[in-house]
Amino acid sequence: MITEEAFPVEPWQIRETRLDLNLLAQSESLFALSNGHIGLRGNLDEGEPYGLPGTYLNSFYEIRPLPYAEAGYGYPEAGQTVVDVTNGKILRLFVEDEPFDVRYGEVIFHERVLDLCAGTLTRRANWRSPADKQVKVVSTRLVSLAHRSVAAIEYVVEALDKFVRVTVQSELVSNEDQPETSGDPRVSAILDNPLEAVEHEATERGGLLMHRTRASSLMMAAGMDHEVEVPGRVEITTDARPDLARTTVICGLRPGQKLRIVKYLAYGWSSLRSRPALHDQATAALHTARYSGWQGLLDAQRAYLNEFWDSADVEVEGDPESQQAVRFGLFHLLQASARAERRAIPSKGLTGTGYDGHAFWDTEGFVLPVLTYTAPHAVADALRWRASTLQLAKDRAAELGLDGASFCWRTIRGQECSAYWPAGTAAWHINADIAMAFERYRIVTGDHSLEEECGLAVLIETARLWLSLGHHDRHGVWHLDGVTGPDEYTAVVRDNVFTNLMAASNLITAADACLRQPEAAKAMGVTTEEMAAWRDAADAANIPYDDELGVHQQCEGFTTFAEWDFEANTTYPLFLHEAYVRLYPAQVIKQADLVLAMQWQSHAFTPEQKARNVDYYERRMVRDSSLSACTQAVMCAEVGHLELAHDYAYEAALIDLRDLHRNTRDGLHMASLAGAWTALVGGFGGLRDDEGILSIDPQLPHGISRLRFRLRWRGFRLTVDARHADVTYTLRDGPGGELTIRHAGEHLTLKSDSPSTIAVRDRKPLLPPPSQPPGREPVSRRHKSLIISAAR
């Protein structure tokens, strides 16, 4: 487990005070740098030792066959796996003839710092070689947010006590060996030498390697160039082979003298451009980097982040761990999306190979809601990527004998890659999640151009899918059969409430969008009768309810399923230890499902229903998913269980920083990082937007004395400063200087010329705090020794 002792709690940085080789893979994920196009895991500069080497380009993947013991019609035949591309991070240091390696000699001091304001990873090390030569190494690494194709490293070596001869080998390396993986289905498949050499060249102070994948036929280029500063004589040479380019720097240093190397990196890939064009793209990016210079890249990085934090920062007084974690989460969300530019946002971002680098519903359901309020330009690009896969989704629906478009459950390029139908294709709700993301973007930003450009087509085709999936019974009630909701322990069911409510919302949203754009809708074949059918299905959707218990059923009949014996089954995650034949017919819930419906479709439930539903389902949720704690935090806060909500918020925020789910080594959990923001802003800030108006209803737990968050809404920048007694709204920018929001259920008009302070509404719980399954209580702020072993 990652501890506070090694990673102290600090508001604007993640600092590792000592190097623990047993936690190397986890720290590589925490210290990953990315801009949404390039991703560099936080591997040590010298390349070894490593937990999981990793350099990624968004959507650069290889195809592999999906094995089936017994295949069936409509099963995907091929999977897609992100490729560990050419590694440009490596700078191998030799002191005299001895390699700098933290496993040998003496590491006198070692520290790494991820600076959330500067956007850099800095490493400081004092090392004494086995021959008693001491050097100080300081490296600073960045992946540029301002320049999409550029990364850079400043590497400084200082002699401390004796004259030393120093050699640095700066490399580009392709087809690195990958460590063996476990049988955990969340771990990536291993690709054996996925890159085929196309071209290699050496320049005066750098080199360039070009490769292509064998099956997906994607081509990539990686280039490097160097600036070298050193007193006295220096020798610089470069050589290149198909899988290796190396620039070697040799010099002598007296005590106090320094060798400074700035390594510029450029990456690009394409499925369409020619080899010369891709070569020239990488070369041009290197020239751009050298023109900017190291200081110019640093300044541009900080300026980009200053602008982001001005509209996105969250301040948490009284809970320093959550303070650090929410900023860490926002930083990585920005890194995953800032320059993705019409590529997917994978569930691990570009921090590791977990889930093969696939994007799921996590993107539209958990990540994009946060970015819509903090970095809307990135959301527009992510939605354009999803829309670019619409034809593939239509082809998939046709293959399955359905109308409209069926977006895939997991993918890189847009084709379905899930080999398990019950927790893949049957999770049809992803189509409504995507539709909701388009509608939220329109509502929050006030920008209709994205809907006009591509969103309308997505809304129409997903609505057509729902109409062909569902049916009216003889009583006129509309049903969805054979569906799986967010809870993957209750699969292929009738009338999952979450799915039915989301589908109904999708249908109504599509009909409303067609009214806003009648000519475009007509051109897509939409008729008045079709829109009426959408609305009729939405109005008639079955929402199962148990009158005897006074709770909604997660799906038809759920409250009559067999109760799960939590006392007898205590090894988690259950999907690694229990057969699905036991899980599916029982009242055991992997993650928030009905409870998530109450968050995303809040208006569909009364306060009393929410309170009773939370009480019932809390006792059955085991959180074998990192997507659950944030939702439970939001809904526990809404029904008045503020201290329990704070524990869930703490767990959601610390999943990666404390490696609570034991799989941070495979990459960070983007949705849970987003969940830290959602738990605080949606839970204790009371933010809702499902009725088309910005609704805020703050209420803080005892452990938080002040919650101050910033967000964007229709051109305005709004700061919400909540305390236990009152909340102050400060409006900046925006059209007209006035904005009407809903505060605690009442309309409130804010003006940009003066802040508005108003009392908060006290939340009194209708029921006592619910219990959880034995051993599945949230990781508590007050009992940090509790550790869960859960799954995504």
Swiss-Prot record:
It is an enzyme of class 3 (hydrolase). Residues 753-792 are annotated as: Disordered. Gene3D superfamilies: 1.50.10.10, Glycoside hydrolase, family 65, N-terminal domain (2.70.98.40), Maltose phosphorylase, domain 3 (2.60.420.10). GO terms for molecular function: carbohydrate binding; glycosyltransferase activity; hydrolase activity, hydrolyzing O-glycosyl compounds. It holds the Pfam family Glyco_hydro_65C. Keywords: Glycosidase, Hydrolase. Residues 766-776 have a biased composition (Pro residues). Transmembrane segments: none annotated. GO terms for biological process: carbohydrate metabolic process. The active site is at E488 (proton donor). Its EC number is 3.2.1.-. It comes from the Bacteria. Substrate binds at W361, D362, K590, Q591. Belongs to the glycosyl hydrolase 65 family. PANTHER family: GLYCOSYL HYDROLASE-RELATED (PTHR11051), GLYCOSYL TRANSFERASE (PTHR11051:SF13). This is Uncharacterized glycosyl hydrolase ML0392. The lineage of its organism: Bacteria, Bacillati, Actinomycetota, Actinomycetes, Mycobacteriales.
